């Protein structure tokens, strides 16, 4: 019983010394306790450590009291005998020594604790309120900066209601704290609480225009963010009757002036509910100037305007329809004429090109027979005869070269004689002439290969073979591709005609309109490339 009384008296004296700030008396008390410990248990620190953990009726330890009262000398003396677990002991107010020092703005004690145990800045109370939050809401900028320097991530700690320190600092208009938090991590601006509110939602509830500007400068994309009730920052600023903040929000071109919340209300609807005052008039005027509307008019046109438009449409419907039909008929007729003209020009250009190519082929074939390699006999009974006349390659060359010459001459005669006024007749002539030119081209190719075998000689026949292997696939591939395009064009023409008939029968044009467009459709339904 006497031992309990002694401990009680010791504790009372100990707490009295701490509260009075009498360091010498406290040291004497601790020294006496340490001396007794040495005699009884030979453990000088256990009794003092136990004394550091003792709590008074309010649940406060000696370290807690010195931190709360900003007794730095007492605190530095006691902290030598304390551990992290001792500092983390909470009082009945649900705060530990570090928490209460941060909340009350005791910078020296906060820095000392951060130096010893940096992890203290992440220890929260029962409501998950961090020491940073407690210091921020009290506008203790130096303490906030000290904790952010040690651990910048502690700014992202949220309370049980989902709010960060920026939410509350923005609500109370603590500009210095807002700047410090955003400077460390701008991502904190987009954090939403359990009501879906960002820091901007909270800031517009206050009266600090600078805080709202600071948040929007950090991230203007949250301008149209909605909370769980569908309210944007403009809704809340209007409902709270904040004319300056409302005007600031409306200066952003990205703002949704007519955003509708879950109650189907716009900012204009909320402005109408405000009590009559100068602020309400300023807000209403700013919203009207920005083009704000009531929720009942969003998504549908004004009835009077719609009725006026309907009457005007009915009045001019017949005249405008007739004029439009006449313009359309003239336009379609003009397009059809231009298209037919383009067809004729294309066919004529092809005809001219074929004539030039045919003349070129004939010239080459004619000159080739008189410019043979090896030249001719100049003496004897065979004067004028080619030196290579006896070779098979020369004979093949003469045959194919003559064939190419005669075909080219025939094409030239046809081109300069026949005149086809109709486009379809021109296409038929060009189609036949094209096939003749294919034959002339093939003969010229064969003549070249034949004379190549004669020129290189038997010892270098590999050169002629190489030329043949190189040229034959190119020419054969080209002619095969052209044949493919020709046959595809022929086979598709019948299908296209049937499709045009079905399409024409399904259209509900008037007789006069279809009469004008039928020819145009027939002429305009064509491939980008036509093979003749």
Curated annotation (Swiss-Prot):
The chain crosses the membrane at residues 354-374, 396-416, 436-456, 467-487. It is found in: Membrane. GO terms for cellular component: membrane. It is a multi-pass membrane protein. InterPro entries: Ankyrin_rpt, Ankyrin_rpt-contain_sf, PGG_dom. Disulfide bonds: none annotated. Keywords: ANK repeat, Membrane, Repeat, Transmembrane, Transmembrane helix. SMART domains: ANK (SM00248). Its main location: membrane. ANK repeats lie at residues 9-38, 58-89, 93-122, 127-156, 161-190, 195-224, 229-259. PANTHER family: OS02G0735700 PROTEIN, PROTEIN PHOSPHATASE 1 REGULATORY SUBUNIT. This is Ankyrin repeat-containing protein At2g01680. It comes from Arabidopsis thaliana.
């Amino acid at each position: 019983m006497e031992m309990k009384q002694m401990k009680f008296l010791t504790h009372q004296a100990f707490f009295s010394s701490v509260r009075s700030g009498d360091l010498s008396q406290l040291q004497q008390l601790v020294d006496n306790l340490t001396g007794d410990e040495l005699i009884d248990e030979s453990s000088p620190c256990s009794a003092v450590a136990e004394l550091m953990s003792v709590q008074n009726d309010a649940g406060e330890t000696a370290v807690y009291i010195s931190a709360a009262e900003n007794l730095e000398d007492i605190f530095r003396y006691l902290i030598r005998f304390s551990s992290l677990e001792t500092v983390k002991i909470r009082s009945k107010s649900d705060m530990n020594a570090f928490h209460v020092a941060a909340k009350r703005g005791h910078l020296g004690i906060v820095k000392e604790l951060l130096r010893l145990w940096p992890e203290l800045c992440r220890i929260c109370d029962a409501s998950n309120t961090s020491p940073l939050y407690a210091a921020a809401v009290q506008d203790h900028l130096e303490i906030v900066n000290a904790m952010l320097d040690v651990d910048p991530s502690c700014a992202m700690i949220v309370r049980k209601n989902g709010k960060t320190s920026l939410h509350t600092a923005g609500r109370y208009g603590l500009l210095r704290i807002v700047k410090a938090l955003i400077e460390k991590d701008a991502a904190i601006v987009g954090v939403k609480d359990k009501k879906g509110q960002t820091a901007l939602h909270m800031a517009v509830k206050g009266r600090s225009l600078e805080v709202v500007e600071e948040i929007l400068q950090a991230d203007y994309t949250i301008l149209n963010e909605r909370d769980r009730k569908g309210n944007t920052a403009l809704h809340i600023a209007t409902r709270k009757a904040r004319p300056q903040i409302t005007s600031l929000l409306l200066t952003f071109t990205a703002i949704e002036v007519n955003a509708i919340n879950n109650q189907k209300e716009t900012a204009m609807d909320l402005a109408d509910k405000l009590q009559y005052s100068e602020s309400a008039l300023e807000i209403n005027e700013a919203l009207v100037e920005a083009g704000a509307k009531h929720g009942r008019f969003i998504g549908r046109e004004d009835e009077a305007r719609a009725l006026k438009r309907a009457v005007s449409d009915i009045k001019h419907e017949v005249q405008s329809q007739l004029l439009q039909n006449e313009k359309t008929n003239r336009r379609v007729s003009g397009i059809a004429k231009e298209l037919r003209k383009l067809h004729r020009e294309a066919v004529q250009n092809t005809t001219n090109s074929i004539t030039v190519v045919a003349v070129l082929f004939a010239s080459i074939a004619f000159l080739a027979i008189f410019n043979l390699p090896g030249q001719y006999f100049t003496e004897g009974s065979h004067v004028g005869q080619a030196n290579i006349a006896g070779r098979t390659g020369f004979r093949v060359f003469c045959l194919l070269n003559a064939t190419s010459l005669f075909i080219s001459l025939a094409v030239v005669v046809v081109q300069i004689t026949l005149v086809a006024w109709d486009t379809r007749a021109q296409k038929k002539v060009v189609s036949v002439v094209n096939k003749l030119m294919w034959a002339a081209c093939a003969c010229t190719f064969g003549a070249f290969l034949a004379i190549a075998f004669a020129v290189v000689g038997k010892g270098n026949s590999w050169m002629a073979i190489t030329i043949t292997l190189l040229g034959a696939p190119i020419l054969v591939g080209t002619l095969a591709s052209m044949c493919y395009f020709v046959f595809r064009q022929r086979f598709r023409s019948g299908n296209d005609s049937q499709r045009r008939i079905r399409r024409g029968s399904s259209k509900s044009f008037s007789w006069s309109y279809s009469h004008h467009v039928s020819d145009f459709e027939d002429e305009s339904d064509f491939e980008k490339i036509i093979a003749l």
